[in-house]
Amino acid sequence: KKQIAYTVSYYSVPQNKSNSEVFVMNADGSDNTQITHDAWQEGQPTWFKDGKKLAFLCNESGSSQVWEMNPDGSGRKQLTQYEGDIEGFSFSPDGKELLFIAQVKTVKSTADKHPDLPKATGIIVTDLMYKHWDEWVTTAPHPFVADFDGNAISNVTDILEGEPYESP
């Protein structure tokens, strides 16, 4: 039987926060079941391992990482231990590689440029034709590719290493 996995976000105005949970249902719309019930943000559920598992993003470990679980919500296991938040991911067709998106620092802060001035926050910009944003941006999303053995990633490579560009 074919199944669909999706997320639902719940919002609390008094608490000024949201929570996302994962649901699974049959493709015909029957048996709609919530499979996560916790305070963590879970999202982007993706079928993998021949449809036997769901991969998803979760911030249970303190940052957004790729996790796996069974279609009934049991057997949760963290698959990545990347030092920052993973914002999106996709497995290669053979399941042996993981492509993921994460923010990388692209501009040195004033404190990085001038360690002798730790309280300085000013920035002088001389190479922009016009101001095109309303805040100073020091990171950009980069695509990373990593080997995946079914349980963990290794050989992580930033495809745009050293570049200030955003992708995707």
What do the predicted segments below correspond to?
Residues 10-14, 60-63, 105-108:
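Short glycine/acidic-enriched loop and turn motifs that connect beta-strands
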Residues 15-17, 25-43, 48, 58, ...:
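Multi-bladed beta-propeller domains
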Residues 11-17, 57-59, 131-137:
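Short consensus segments that form the blades of beta-propeller domains
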Residues 66-100, 104:
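Repeat-solenoid scaffold signature
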Residues 1-20:
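Beta-strand-rich domains and repeat architectures in extracellular enzymes and scaffolds
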Residues 4, 35, 51-55, 79, ...:
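Hydrophobic beta-strand positions that form the internal "hydrophobic ladder"
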Residues 19-20, 103-149:
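Predominantly five- to eight-bladed beta-propeller fold
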